Amino acid sequence: MTARGPDVDAELVERVRRGDMRAFEMLVVKYQRRIQRLVARMVRDVDLVEDIAQETFIRAYRALPQFRGESAFYTWLYRIAVNTAKKALMELRRDPLIVESALAVDEDEETS
């Protein structure tokens, strides 16, 4: 297996469970761009993409004790990212002030 394979992910996950924050940083570095690209297919706002990607990793870290390893780590992380993006989009639709604020920023940028 290569240094990028699931065996390495399983080892990193186990190290994180034992308190090794550096191992979690390695998982973030490994998957951050992939998660950002995934979220960008669902969300057009670049800042929101970054926020959702960051929230994905926060949620993954908090849920790591429940990760059973029945699927690849990235598969699990992918699902967290999709659910986090869906939740963010639903919140945007529910709160018209957020949408208005985002539109105002877009209008300001267009007139500058």
Where are these regions (language model features)?
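Short, charged helix-capping/linker segments at alpha-helix termini
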Residues: T2-A3, R17-M26, Q36-E55
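Internal acidic/polar
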Residues: T2-D9, D95-S112
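Hydrophobic side chains within well-formed alpha-helices
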Residues: D9-L12, A23-F24, I52, F73, ...
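A short, glycine- and basic residue-enriched loop/turn
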Residues: M21, Q32, V46, E50, ...
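Structural recognition of an alpha-helix C-terminal capping motif at a helix-to-coil junction
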Residues: D51-I58, S71-N83
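Arg/Lys-rich amphipathic alpha helix in sigma70-family domain 2
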Residues: P65-G69, R79-E100
